[in-house]
Amino acid sequence: MKGLRINMYYGDETKDLNSKLLIFIRMNISKKDLLRINQGFGGNLRSSSSLDFVFERIDTGKIGPYRKLAHLIRAILVDHPFSDGNKRTAMFVAFAFAKEYNKAIDRDLLLHHIISIASKNIQIIRNIEWRLKNAIK
């Protein structure tokens, strides 16, 4: 992840992923955080039902971090809750996850998987989790 820079625009201020990662502490992300991330990519919320469901699901302590990430990525890429920036938001969430857990990312493979999940509407969580584990080690 050295040299990786993702800049997001928040009003008059640009925040950098490397200098300040504000949302992930052991998958402690809120819907409000996710909406703010997506707004940084120029999107707006279209439908909140899928996000409400996924946050209810990942708040239980019974599933592991990759499974939680898979649920969140699925909700973003398959259900398209935002008007724009769904894939960029999913990519940011994956980078933030890797940063929090000190994991290495195969960026090209992760991008391939994100595009594949979105274009093929892959809904099987186990399959999404496997893809994420492949790209984030």
Where are these regions (language model features)?
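FIC/Doc superfamily catalytic core
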Residues: 1-137
